[in-house]
Amino acid sequence: MIKKDEVFKIGIFNKPHGVKGEISFTFTDDIFDRVECEYLVCLLDGIFVPFFIEEYRFRSDTTALVKLEGVDTSEKARMFTNVEVYFPKKYVGEEEDSDDIPTWNYFIGFKVEDVNHGELGEIVAVDDSTMNVLFAIEKGGEELLLPAHEEFITKLDKKKRLLTVEVPDGLI
C-alpha cells in the first residue's frame, strides 16, 4: 500500500481527450518526464493507486495528454476526471548528498526547524499561486506561512525528513 509520505502531488487529471482513453493532465512539475519511472500514482477514493503510463505527449509547458495502461476508452478515462496525480518520491534523488529537489511540493510532510527559533512544525501544504511560493507549516493547530526560498534553507535531511532553515527576523 502506498502512503501519502511516499509521494508528492504533481498535478490533476482533467477530462478525457478523444475516444482512445487519453486523459488531459495539468501538472505543476514535469518530473514524470525527467525521471525514469513507469507509473503515476492517483488518489482514488482516499487510496493511492499506481497506474502504468503507456505514453504521453505535451500540449504545453503545463499540460500533457496521458495514456494509461488498461484505459482504452473515453468512458474509462472519464473515471479519472479531477483525480489528483502524485509521483513516487523514491524515484527522486533520495541520496543523502543529492541536492536534486524537483518541486517545493516534495517537502510536504517534512518537519521544519529554525536555527534561532527551534521547531516550527510540519509542512502541510505549498501555496504556489503567486510568484512568492509559501510553505504552510502547522503546529498545534496553528498555521504559519513561510517563504519557500533556497537562501533560507541551511540543511536538508531527506532520511529524517527534516528541513532546517534560518529565517530573517520578522517572518516568524
From Swiss-Prot:
| Pfam families linked to this entry | PRC_RimM, RimM
Query: Any idea where the PRC barrel domain is?
Result: 99-171
Going by the UniProt record, its keywords in alphabetical order are: Chaperone, Cytoplasm, Ribosome biogenesis, rRNA processing
Record family assignment:
Belongs to the RimM family.
Assembly and oligomerization? Binds ribosomal protein uS19.
- What is the role of the protein in this entry? An accessory protein needed during the final step in the assembly of 30S ribosomal subunit, possibly for assembly of the head region. Essential for efficient processing of 16S rRNA. May be needed both before and after RbfA during the maturation of 16S rRNA. It has affinity for free ribosomal 30S subunits but not for 70S ribosomes.
Q: Write down the HAMAP family for this protein, in alphabetical order.
A: Ribosome_mat_RimM
Underlying gene: rimM
Q: Which InterPro entries match?
A: PRC_barrel-like_sf, PRC_RimM, RimM, RimM_N, RimM_N_sf, Transl_B-barrel_sf
Superkingdom classification of source:
Bacteria
Q: Where in the cell is it found?
A: Cytoplasm
The free-text domain remark for this protein reads: The PRC barrel domain binds ribosomal protein uS19.
Q: List the disulfide bonds.
A: none
User: Any one Gene Ontology biological process term?
Assistant: rRNA processing
Protein's name in the database: Ribosome maturation factor RimM
Give any GO molecular function from the UniProt entry. ribosome binding
Q: List the GO cellular component terms.
A: cytoplasm; ribosome
